Each structure stands twice: as C-alpha cells, then as structure tokens.
Amino acid sequence: MKKQKSVIMVVAKYPTTFGHTSVINYLCKGLNELGYRTAIGAFSFDADPPFNIEKIKLNKRKLLTTGNSYLDFDLIHAHQARVLYYLLSVKPTKPVVFHYHGASNKIQETNFKIAMWRYKDKISKIISVSYAGINQMKQLVKDISAEVVYNGVDTKLFNQDLPAPYKKGTPQLLFVSGLRKYKK
C-alpha cells in the first residue's frame, strides 16, 4: 500500500496572529480533502485546530539538535520566519516551504532579514500570499526568489450568491486581510 503524502504547517504558537490561523486551517482542510495527511505543528497551543486537524507539539531542543528529520511528514510548511531558526539550524532532510505573510513591524522585518541571511539557501521554496508581499521581501532582501500563491477560498463557505438580506449596496467588495502599510 502506498504511503499517504503528508504536510505539517509550522508556527511558533497556535492560534497565531491575524489571518495566519485561517490560512493554515483551510490549507490543512483542503489538503485533507485531497487525500493528504496534514497537521499543525507549534511550540505551544492555546486552542485545538478545527476540522479534526492533527496537532503536533514541537520540541525546540529536538529540532535544534536533529533538525526536521524527527518530524514524520514529507513536507514542512513554515508560516513564520522565527520558526526557521529551529527548522533549519541542522541541514534539513525534508523540503521546507516558507510561506511569507508579510512583516508588519521593524522587529519582524529584522527577524526576516536575519532568517533569510542564515537560511535562505536551505529553504526549498519561498511563497507569498501576494505580490505586495514579494515586493516587501525584495526591499528587505535584494536577492530573493519567491512565487505568489494566493490564499485559497472555500467557495461553499464564502460565495457570491448570498441571499439578498446579506448584501448591502452595490458594488460588493469582500476584503479579508489586515490593513498594513506595505500593502498600499
């Protein structure tokens, strides 16, 4: 029997800030529906993930000493620069995707620069949720290569054909994001 492909979404703390949590939850849900095994890995959890998504409490010491080899997943999908220090201190044995959601303050910008300086060449693929994110990355780190992978939308939950009582005015604009200066 063929082994089920697997992906772990990694953050420092779950639930995380702003839209990260929704992105991670719906990525896991969508991948599960496609037949993948998914989990959310974090150093601490303040809540359980929805949709029966597996939760993995990560061990900082183990990651720092053995790298990502101890994680029983085919792909490691990091959603924050700060977790890269643990995931990539030891040469990775499994591919690591870094999902850039933007840096909203100087501390996050500085952390991103340091993480990229140290680990950029160990990351298999860097993706961003928008071209604004890629532009911000390139302002912070000149020689960086990334691709846009837009946030997915569950069309059963979010759809344009809502009954009239839910629609106010014309035209309709659905905006789901955090207002950040770099998004202009």
What is the predicted role of each segment?
Residues K3-Q4, M9-K62:
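N-terminal strand-loop element at the rim of the active site
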Residues A78-V83, Y100:
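Short His-centered aromatic/hydrophobic patch
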Residues Y70, A103, E109-I126:
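Membrane-proximal helix-turn-helix segments that form the acceptor-binding/catalytic region
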Residues I76-H77, K122-Y131:
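A short beta-strand/loop micro-motif in the catalytic core of glycosyltransferases
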Residues V10-A12, V129, F175-L179:
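Short hydrophobic "strand-cap" motifs at the C-terminus of beta-strands
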Residues A132, G152:
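Carbohydrate-associated surface elements
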Residues T17-F18, T155, R180-K184:
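A short, basic/aromatic alpha-helical/loop segment that forms part
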Residues Y166-K183:
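Conserved donor-binding/catalytic core segment of Leloir-type glycosyltransferases
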